[in-house]
Amino acid sequence: MNKPKIFTTSFASVYPLYVQKADKKGRTKEEVDTIICWLTGYDQQALQRQIDKGVDFETFFAQAPQINPNALKITGVICGYRVEEIEDPPMQKLRYLDKMIDELAKGKPMEKILRK
């Protein structure tokens, strides 16, 4: 089975789009980074290294130090799919990130986005 194209897309090429989406709604790059680090376990320096290396999404998530256990609390629909029902773990992680960035752009408070 072929991998979805997004997995071979570099994280660095999509990252600015996440920041741009947040910025358009008055949110910050720092908030985007906080979300990414919360979900993946990367610290700020490791996140920047992954961006600088141009790793693809598959590698980005495969090398993530630890997916936050509270990611299981992320529910809802993104790209027409319920994130909690996605059976492919790499795709589910990607959709978790999409969902959280979407919530940020919709003005949700960080405490709720980070499932605190």
PLM features per residue range, with description:
Residues M1-K116:
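A charge-rich, low-complexity, intrinsically flexible signal that marks solvent-exposed coils, linkers
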